[in-house]
UniProtKB/Swiss-Prot annotation:
Listed name of the protein: Elongation factor P-like protein
GO biological process, one term: peptide biosynthetic process
UniProt cross-references to Pfam families, sorted A to Z: EFP, EFP_N, Elong-fact-P_C
UniProt similarity note: Belongs to the elongation factor P family.
Listed NCBIfam families: PRK00529.1, PRK04542.1, yeiP
Record InterPro entries: Elong-fact-P_C (IPR015365), NA-bd_OB-fold (IPR012340), Rib_uL2_dom2 (IPR014722), Transl_elong_fac_P/YeiP (IPR020599), Transl_elong_KOW-like (IPR013185), Transl_elong_p-like_YeiP (IPR011897), Transl_elong_P/YeiP_cen (IPR001059), Transl_elong_P/YeiP_CS (IPR013852)
Annotated Gene Ontology cellular component terms: cytoplasm
Upper classification of the organism: Bacteria, Pseudomonadati, Pseudomonadota, Gammaproteobacteria, Enterobacterales
Any GO MF annotation of the entry: translation elongation factor activity
Coiled-coil zones: none
PANTHER family: ELONGATION FACTOR P, TRANSLATION ELONGATION FACTOR KOW-LIKE DOMAIN-CONTAINING PROTEIN
Length: 190
């Protein structure tokens, strides 16, 4: 059991007899005094895959489910299924493309370290990515010299198809670090 203000992205809650995976949380603080903060949560139903949206007050109690986490590595694509191998015992985990469509935007061609498979009671629930990823810019407007002083951004498409705003001074071919939960540019990759 946890209060709504303690729920984080990637957790699973049991709500209305449904297992719901938390995909996103928006915090809304009302301007009136004494009013409680609202948490608008977007879920994915674990059993059906449907998207669910609910609102909670900060002190509402939710039933959280403890998940098993296994570190995996992207292995190969088999038709419309993506296969990830367990790093310890080499167990294959299969995901359909539509199950992990969002996550695929952040996984580069050679894979990335830190990917975890979330399971509960032997059932595979989701794929969890690390907080950051380094991706290469493949398409953007040409870089402008001396634009580092301005805070203006331009859209850039990464090697995986993801499009995010980046500073004007960056150009195609550069590797950048992206904060996955917020889909934002953090800096140049090392």
């Amino acid at each position: 059991m946890a209060r709504a203000n303690e729920i984080k992205r990637g957790m699973v809650v049991n709500y209305n007899d449904k297992l719901l995976l938390v995909k996103d949380i928006d915090v809304q603080s009302p301007s009136a005094r004494g009013a409680s903060t609202l948490y608008k949560m977007r879920f994915s139903d674990v059993r059906t895959g449907l998207k669910v949206e609910e609102r909670f007050k900060g002190d509402d109690i939710l039933d959280t489910i403890t998940l098993t986490r296994r570190t995996v590595t992207f292995s190969y694509i088999d038709g419309d299924e993506y296969v990830f191998m367990d790093d310890e015992d080499y167990t294959p985990y299969l995901f359909k493309k539509d199950q992990i469509e969002e996550e695929l935007l952040f996984i580069p061609e050679g894979g990335m370290p830190g990917i975890q498979v979330l399971s509960w009671d032997g059932q595979i629930i989701a794929l969890e990515l690390p907080q950051t990823v380094d991706l290469e810019i493949v398409d953007t407007a040409p870089g402008i010299k001396g634009a580092s002083a301005s805070a203006r951004n331009k859209p850039a498409t990464m090697s995986t198809g993801l499009t995010i705003p980046v500073p004007e001074y960056l150009s195609a071919g550069e590797k950048i670090r992206i904060h996955i939960p917020e889909r934002r540019y953090m800096g140049r990759a090392d």
